[in-house]
From Swiss-Prot:
It catalyses: UDP-N-acetyl-alpha-D-muramoyl-L-alanine + D-glutamate + ATP = UDP-N-acetyl-alpha-D-muramoyl-L-alanyl-D-glutamate + ADP + phosphate + H(+). The gene is murD. Keywords: ATP-binding, Cell cycle, Cell division, Cell shape, Cell wall biogenesis/degradation, Cytoplasm, Ligase, Nucleotide-binding, Peptidoglycan synthesis. It comes from Nitratidesulfovibrio vulgaris (strain DSM 19637 / Miyazaki F) (Desulfovibrio vulgaris). Its EC number is 6.3.2.9. HAMAP family: MurD (MF_00639). This is UDP-N-acetylmuramoylalanine--D-glutamate ligase. The keyword Protein biosynthesis does not apply. InterPro entries: FAD-bd (IPR002938), Mur-like_cat_sf (IPR036565), Mur_ligase_C (IPR004101), Mur_ligase_C_dom_sf (IPR036615), Mur_ligase_cen (IPR013221), MurD (IPR005762). GO terms for molecular function: ATP binding; FAD binding; UDP-N-acetylmuramoylalanine-D-glutamate ligase activity. Pathway: Cell wall biogenesis; peptidoglycan biosynthesis. PANTHER family: UDP-N-ACETYLMURAMOYLALANINE--D-GLUTAMATE LIGASE. Its main location: cytoplasm.
């Protein structure tokens, strides 16, 4: 399989491309494909899932929209298929033709990458810390005076950058000096020629096993980020993946960042893991000419990311912290290590797997109480109930859990919502869960 985007299969005028999913990246891909002259068919299971303004645009542009369950006939004759990040490639393949007539499966990221005109890419992946790290990278680069596009899994699809270049581009100044991209294992599974100049794998822990067949597939997806990199490129890794790196034959220069460097101590970011994110960002940005002075200023001015160990209030001497983005057992471990005060811990949601019992040594002596809400009660109580020196309780909804946490907390404590689960039992996404937590805290008497 070629890594040269110029010799990879091309999409010509009139070629049929099927886009699966009407999320932001799917709609951006459809618009870009239309601009390229392709014949576009967009599939969306939810009949109400396509925004009205996009439906109007599609009607004017001649882009077909089909709702309902996907069928093999919808993919017949397709030159390529662009799946939503949430659709596993393994579930898509049975719907497609095989052999010489098989369409290419490409992520929206891959589609957009092939349309770029030489802009250097700094890409970041990892189980946790991606969004904070790419945001730190963007801040450091901008502090150096560089124009930056920040996007990918963080929110703005790369296709939107490609479409925008003719209309002012990143930072309103045409083409960006650097494209800073957050990329997930979902997106990487369908990337074939994507080549960053600098790429970073922060860490790997058990995650998304409801999507990937097993841990090996998840790890392989993460390492696809480095597949097309060359000797002049730079691959940056956390110390925790050193053995995984040693088992692979990688072409680019490699660097393992020092998570304990504490190079830029002036920051309001909580936790040692954020010091690691800062060091990783610095090592990446040095490649683009960022000076220590510019990086130091960027770190000092950097505000905590929403829903990531975000201090939302301090009431009666109690610090309230929203870590709704904490969706895994490993992320909960990191969250707990960030506090040197007693914690009232709030957990619960749709459990994605992981060894909760392994957290018991960290919970004991550190956690005053555990207050759960929503789904997964059996997982948490099965692992922790009666095993430590902290009481546990459970509530069907978030609001009564916040009220009980307030009653249990003492001055000097932190109430930390670090659910260690996805949000899909009670909320549409982790952001909605975080906002609900903030509202519940603000409503306390």
């Amino acid at each position: 399989m070629t890594c040269d985007k110029h010799t990879a299969q091309t999409i010509g005028k009139g070629d049929l491309v099927v886009v699966v999913g009407a999320g932001r990246s799917g709609m951006a891909a459809a618009r870009l494909l239309h601009r390229m002259g392709a014949r576009v068919r967009l599939l969306e299971r939810n009949a109400d899932g396509v925004p009205a303004d996009f439906v109007r645009w599609a009607a004017e542009a001649g882009v077909e929209i089909a709702t309902g369950d996907h069928a093999p006939t919808q993919f017949e004759g397709a030159r390529a298929v662009v799946p939503s990040p949430g659709m596993a490639v393994s579930k898509l393949r049975p719907l497609l033709a095989q052999g010489p007539d098989a369409p290419e499966i490409m992520a929206e990221m891959e589609l957009a990458w092939r349309q770029l005109d030489g802009e250097p890419v700094l890409a970041v992946t990892g189980t946790s810390g991606k969004t904070t790290t790419v945001s730190l990278c963007a801040a450091m680069l901008r502090a150096q005076g560089l124009s930056v596009f920040l996007g990918g899994n963080i929110g703005t699809p790369l296709s939107e950058y490609v479409l925008s270049v003719a209309h002012g581009g990143a930072d309103g100044q045409g083409r960006a000096d650097v494209l800073v991209i957050e990329i997930s294992s979902f997106q990487l599974q369908a990337c074939t020629t994507f080549r960053p100049r600098v790429a970073m794998l922060l860490n790997i822990s058990e995650n998304h096993l409801d999507y990937h067949a097993d841990m090996a597939e998840y790890i392989d997806a993460k390492f696809r980020l480095f597949r097309c990199m060359e000797e002049g490129d730079l691959a940056i890794f956390g110390q925790g993946v050193r053995d995984l790196v040693a088992a692979r034959d990688l072409k680019p220069r490699t660097l393992f960042f020092d998570a304990a460097a504490r190079r830029f101590p002036r920051t309001c970011l909580l936790g040692g893991h954020n010091q690691a994110n800062i060091e990783a960002a610095w090592q990446a940005c040095r490649e683009f000419g960022v000076t220590p002075e510019a990086a130091e200023k960027a770190v000092a001015d950097f505000a905590p990311m929403e829903h990531r160990l975000e201090a939302v209030a301090e009431r009666n001497g109690v610090l309230w912290v929203n870590d709704s983005k904490c969706t895994t057992v490993e992320a909960l471990r990191v969250a707990l290590q960030a506090f040197d005060r007693p914690v009232v811990l709030m957990v619960g949601g749709k459990f994605k797997g992981g060894d909760l019992a392994s957290l018991l040594p960290l919970l004991c002596g550190r956690v005053r109480a555990v207050v759960g809400f929503g789904a997964s009660r059996e997982h948490f109580e099965g692992a922790w109930m009666g095993q430590g020196d902290f009481p546990m309780s459970w509530h069907p909804a978030l609001e009564p859990a916040v009220a009980e946490a307030a009653a249990l907390a003492r001055p000097g404590d932190a109430v930390v919502m670090a659910p260690a689960t996805s949000s899909f039992d009670l909320f549409a996404n982790y952001k909605e869960r975080g906002h609900a937590f903030r509202r519940a805290v603000e409503a306390l008497p």
